[in-house]
Amino acid sequence: MTSSANLRPDIVLIGAGIMGATFGTLLKELNPSYSMMMFERLSDCGQESSQSWNNAGTGHAANCELNYTPQRPDGTVEITQALRVNTEFDLSRQLWSYLVTKGAIPDPQSFIHPCPHMSMVWGAENVAFLKARFQAMSAHHCYHGMEYTEDGAQIEKWAPLTMEGRDPAEPVAATRIITGTDVDYGSLTHLLVAHLKAQPDFDLHYNTEVEGLDREPDGRWRVTFKDVNSGERHSVSAGFVFIGAGGASIDLLQKSNIPEGKGYGGFPVSGIWLRCDVDAVTQRHHAKVYGKASSGSPPMSVPHLDTRVIDGKTSLLFGPYAGFSTKFLKHGSLTDLFGSITLHNIGPLLDVGRHNIELTEYLIAQVLQTHHHQFEMLKAFFPNAKRADWKEAVAGQRVQVIKPYPDGGGFLEFGTEIVPAADHSLVALLGASPGASTAAAIALEVLEACFADRLTDDAWLPALKRIIPTYGIDLREDAEACRASRAATASVLNIDNI
């Protein structure tokens, strides 16, 4: 705390995960003169949900995740949500390509790798659903190149482990799109934070926990923080505060005391993976294969068998198995859930409990699952799997948003919720899904919510369009812009394009 800029930063970023790193990077590109401070409770960046093994690492483009494409009563499939997620991933690709081109990210293969995305189902009813889904998606330019088959021999060519040992009489179907990716969001977070650290007027503080957010008379924010090792406390006066602290965001939003945050709560869902590092197995599977979730299960619990490339090493991941913990962070406290309950959100919390019995029953069943039952679930995807080849790994915590109704009730929101202060001086990010893949789209939403007056031709808009060339263009409607953008970003990122 040696200079006046350090004592009165323009921007404070709370949380050194993929969201804080992405938003900080974008904001610094738009206004390099901003002074910024980033606070992280842990000893390094990207150690919670952004950490490589704490998430699935899918470049979520809604290619293979069946929960984005619900079936209508007439048997047809709704793809509106899938198209939104699909084109939001394009925004991330454009931001990453910009950073690679300018040299901020030296090697794209340090965080992203080509990996086909597949959906696979079995049973006549599920096959009919996947066929209807393919018919709807393949007719749209955003899903150009998607393949479909009900031929077990063809599926075996695409993903051999999924078919070997399977009953040949069982109906199966799969879709594949070869333009999919595997993304190491932990590595990407480190790359973004390293780039930020190299910028002028950027201060990074690890092992630092934000304890207070208080309004000052001039409208700025008094941010009080503690060194978790020494216990020393300091404070700064911030012009704008970005709360991107994952599961800790609920608590920080409550500390800010903004009226817009009243009533929000959190529901934590934990996850467990099975992981295989045996080369003889991992070398025979190159895809992310998503199945169909059980009825009542949350979106993050769609089972999938994935190729993962982390630190240059290829592994396989299967899961997740959902669970319940009262922690809001993997490195959090068992009292997190109880500490988050206030007079303002207890009504919405109780309302959600009453109206989500199916989810509650699902989580209880998952928690009570034995290792045998978990492995049987893997064998539904990989019939010849050997127990000795797989070990258990604990995923990151996902805190789903409980959003208040005006009447005092509430509902469970599985997306990402942006909660800005009325004067745009503070914003909190809540929720977990779809998460890191759409970090650029979420960062743009924050810009539009809190910096709308700067998004003009005589301010930030020209620079923003250099970073995100399709900003302001709906890629769901403009097929040519979509094709051109994907060709350009695939070339820079060295990923597949068709």
From Swiss-Prot:
Keywords: FAD, Flavoprotein, Oxidoreductase, Tricarboxylic acid cycle. This is Probable malate:quinone oxidoreductase. SUPFAM superfamilies: FAD/NAD(P)-binding domain. One of its GO terms (molecular function) is 2-hydroxyglutarate dehydrogenase activity. Its cofactor is FAD. InterPro entries: FAD/NAD-bd_sf, MQO. GO terms for biological process: tricarboxylic acid cycle. Pathway: Carbohydrate metabolism; tricarboxylic acid cycle; oxaloacetate from (S)-malate (quinone route): step 1/1. It is an enzyme of class 1 (oxidoreductase). Gene3D superfamilies: D-Amino Acid Oxidase, subunit A, domain 2, FAD/NAD(P)-binding domain. Belongs to the MQO family. Its EC number is 1.1.5.4. It catalyses: (S)-malate + a quinone = a quinol + oxaloacetate.
